[in-house]
From Swiss-Prot:
Subcellular location(s) per record: Cytoplasm
Organism of this sequence: Methanococcus maripaludis (strain C7 / ATCC BAA-1331)
GO biological process: positive regulation of translational elongation; positive regulation of translational termination
Main location (coarse class): cytoplasm
Family that this chain belongs to: Belongs to the eIF-5A family.
Task of the protein: Functions by promoting the formation of the first peptide bond.
SMART domains given in the database record: eIF-5a
Modification type Hypusine: residues: 37
CDD domains: S1_aIF5A
Protein known as: Translation initiation factor 5A
Gene3D superfamilies: 2.30.30.30, Nucleic acid-binding proteins (2.40.50.140)
NCBIfam families per record: eIF_5A (TIGR00037), PRK03999.1 (NF003076)
InterPro entries membership: IF5A-like (IPR001884), IF5A-like_N (IPR048670), NA-bd_OB-fold (IPR012340), Rib_uL2_dom2 (IPR014722), Trans_elong_IF5A_hypusine_site (IPR019769), Transl_elong_IF5A_arc (IPR022847), Transl_elong_IF5A_C (IPR020189), Translation_prot_SH3-like_sf (IPR008991)
Length: 131
C-alpha cells in the first residue's frame, strides 16, 4: 500500500497523520482561529515526521484539503540484524524487507516478532510484539 488520500484540513486532530511538504508526519498540535468578520477560519498544524524527527508546520484555511498518508500496519519476524538495518519477514506475505534499525525501540533481536508500518514507500519498526 502506498500513496495518499485527500482529507479536510479542518477535521485533522492530534495524533492523526498528514503529509506536509512531501513528508509523512504525526500531528502534535492543532489551533483553529477565525481572524475576523469576513475571513474564513484558519487551521495551524504542528507535526513531527514519522521517519525523520523533523518538525513541520502548516497553516491554511479550514475548508482546504490536505493529503493523508495511507499507512499499512503489519507484523513481521526479525530474521537478522545487519549493522544499521534489520531484515524482517512479513508474517502474512512471507516477503523479506530491510528496514533501518530504530533508535527508540528496545529489544530487537533475531527471532522476535515486531510491528512495522509502511507509508509512502518507506518502512519503520514501531514496537516489539513478542520475544
Amino acid at each position: 500500500m502506498a500513496g495518499t488520500k485527500p482529507g479536510d484540513l479542518g477535521g485533522v486532530k492530534v495524533g492523526q497523520y498528514v503529509v506536509i511538504e512531501g513528508v509523512a508526519c504525526k500531528v502534535m498540535d492543532t489551533a483553529h482561529s477565525k481572524p475576523g468578520k469576513h475571513g474564513g477560519a484558519k487551521v495551524r498544524l504542528v507535526a513531527v515526521g514519522i521517519f525523520e524527527p523533523v518538525k513541520k508546520e502548516h497553516v491554511g484555511p479550514a475548508s482546504s484539503r490536505i493529503d493523508i498518508p495511507l499507512i499499512d500496519k503489519r507484523k513481521g519476524q526479525v530474521l537478522a540484524l545487519m549493522g544499521d538495518n534489520v531484515q524482517i519477514m512479513d508474517m502474512e506475505t512471507y516477503e523479506t524487507l530491510e528496514i533501518p534499525m530504530p533508535d527508540d525501540v528496545e529489544g530487537i533481536e533475531s527471532g522476535v516478532e515486531v510491528e512495522y508500518f509502511e507509508a509512502m514507500d518507506r518502512y519503520k519498526i514501531t514496537r516489539v510484539i513478542s520475544k
